[in-house]
UniProtKB/Swiss-Prot annotation:
Family membership noted in the UniProt record: Belongs to the universal ribosomal protein uS4 family.
Database matches in CDD domains: S4
GO BP: any one term: translation
GO cellular component: small ribosomal subunit
Designated name of the protein: Small ribosomal subunit protein uS4
InterPro entries the record matches: Ribosomal_uS4, Ribosomal_uS4_bac-type, Ribosomal_uS4_CS, Ribosomal_uS4_N, S4_RNA-bd, S4_RNA-bd_sf
Role of this protein: One of the primary rRNA binding proteins, it binds directly to 16S rRNA where it nucleates assembly of the body of the 30S subunit.
Keyword list, A-Z: Ribonucleoprotein, Ribosomal protein, RNA-binding, rRNA-binding
Span of domain S4 RNA-binding: 96-158
Subunit composition and interactions: Part of the 30S ribosomal subunit. Contacts protein S5. The interaction surface between S4 and S5 is involved in control of translational fidelity.
One example GO MF annotation: rRNA binding
Length: 206
């Protein structure tokens, strides 16, 4: 399956919630009416079956993190092999992706932009260049921006936007050195309450 490159607003409208696919430079409501589904004007959201709810939740999380279907299923399989709650393990694996850590640290205004920054060799992990967006960042790893990438306008813009975000305690950001330390895996309570990972577990458990 190819990566989606169409309007990101359409995806948020499909899921009925902000998937954090836009930069946040303006309020989402001014750019994207998430309360209406894409397609026919004024169409209402139909009542979903149990399977439909599970599928929509999986699609929502997959699109939020920018993961392809096969990748997402593999993350689920890995999460199921770990000790603890499979749903929470899944979210922790997704949060530990390098592109997501770059986004959370404020080095990219969206996860897609952070993914590009990683892919274009603009990111270092413990001083070494890593250009694999899915790279799993471990506790204690230091993620930083390469010197030549620090001057990029998109990086400067992302850093400015990040000042308005609530601090994330599992990632410690040094705004002077432009580096972030991944202190620990996030707890479930730290992550979005709008995600119901149990629905995803139910879907894949069938």
């Amino acid at each position: 399956m190819a990566r989606y490159i169409g309007p990101t607003c359409k995806l948020s409208r499909r899921e009925g919630t902000d998937l954090q696919l836009k930069s946040g430079s303006r309020a989402l409501e001014s750019k994207c009416k998430v309360e209406t589904v894409p397609g026919v004007h004024g169409a209402r959201r139909g009542r979903l079956s149990e399977y439909g709810l599970q599928l929509r939740e999986k699609q929502k999380v997959r699109r939020m993190y920018g993961i392809l279907e096969k990748q997402f299923r593999n993350y689920y399989k890995s999460a199921a092999r770990l000790k603890g709650a499979t749903g929470e393990n899944l979210l922790q694996l997704l949060e530990s992706r390098l592109d997501n850590v770059v986004y959370r640290a404020g080095f990219g205004s969206t996860r897609a932009e952070a993914r590009q920054l990683v892919g274009h060799k603009g990111i270092l992990v413990n001083g070494a260049t890593v250009n694999i967006p899915s790279y799993q960042v471990k506790a204690g790893d230091v993620v930083s921006i390469r010197e030549k990438a620090k001057k990029q306008l998109r990086v400067q813009s992302a850093l400015e936007l990040s000042k308005g975000r609530a601090p994330i305690h599992w990632i410690e950001v040094d705004s002077t050195k432009l580096e972030a330390t991944y202190k620990a895996l996030p707890e479930r309570a730290d992550l979005s309450a709008e995600i119901n990972e149990n629905l995803i577990v139910e879907l894949y458990s069938k």
